């Protein structure tokens, strides 16, 4: 109702509630009518230890499948700060993941600029290209820094807009010869950024060596987050170990 009257409503809740419980309403009322509603949801992916009832590990897959809906996954406080006015200015429905609590700053606050629909190369590297979003961009940068000492040169391409995907930038970076391409995401391996990138590469007949760092296709455990991130392979140390095993 507010959107039809010319307002720009922002709705916020936990990601499990804003996607699973509200899915039909978002699909049939907001997206089908292309209403200017912004849905900002906290605790995406594995960012809570409360178990499957609170872990929105499939939210990107659900939201990517809805026509007209733009999907955003910022990586830190600066990204969120810049993304909010950008999605407010965008005409149409948006789903944005939110990191909760004290969110670190990992981007360059002087040189970074969020642009809707654009991926950003945060660092170059000749050996590995990590394509990531959200929390996993944070971890990818940490892993790249740690691997410098071992002689591995790791590039990080941050993809804050999951839909529409910045196909041109991804194809350009994935076309660099000799680099291992790794997609890292805080989401189930099915239906998220990894499958979107894999489909893009296949449709454009690009066949780099390709790996995926993602959550498994299962209901995840409850527990302390550091333990769960190690268990499911998305902690910095787990990412470093995976990259070393692939190089």
PLM segments and residue spans:
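Conserved thiamine diphosphate
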Residues: 1-129, 200
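Thiamine diphosphate
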Residues: 47-48, 99-247
């Amino acid at each position: 109702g507010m959107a039809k009257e010319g307002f720009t409503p922002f709705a916020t809740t936990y990601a499990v509630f804003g996607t699973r419980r509200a899915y039909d309403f978002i699909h049939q009322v907001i997206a089908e009518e292309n209403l200017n509603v912004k849905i900002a949801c906290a605790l995406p992916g594995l960012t809570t230890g409360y178990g499957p009832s609170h872990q929105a590990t499939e939210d990107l897959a659900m939201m990517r499948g809805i026509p007209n809906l733009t999907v955003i996954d910022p990586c830190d406080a600066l990204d969120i700060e810049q993304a909010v006015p950008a999605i407010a200015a965008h005409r149409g429905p948006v789903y944005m993941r939110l990191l909760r609590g004290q969110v670190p700053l990992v981007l360059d606050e002087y040189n970074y600029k969020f642009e809707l629909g654009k991926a950003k190369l945060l660092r170059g590297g000749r050996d590995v290209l990590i394509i990531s979003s959200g929390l996993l961009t944070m971890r990818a940068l940490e892993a790249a820094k740690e691997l410098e000492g071992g002689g591995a040169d790791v590039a990080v391409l941050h993809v804050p807009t999951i839909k529409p995907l910045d196909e041109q930038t991804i194809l350009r970076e994935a076309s660099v010869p000799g680099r291992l391409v790794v997609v890292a995401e805080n989401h189930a391996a099915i239906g998220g950024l990894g499958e979107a990138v894999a489909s893009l590469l296949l449709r454009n007949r690009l066949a780099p060596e390709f790996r995926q760092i993602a959550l498994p296709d299962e209901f995840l455990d409850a527990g302390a987050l550091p333990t769960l991130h190690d268990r499911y392979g998305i902690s910095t140390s787990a990412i470093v170990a995976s990259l070393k095993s692939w190089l």
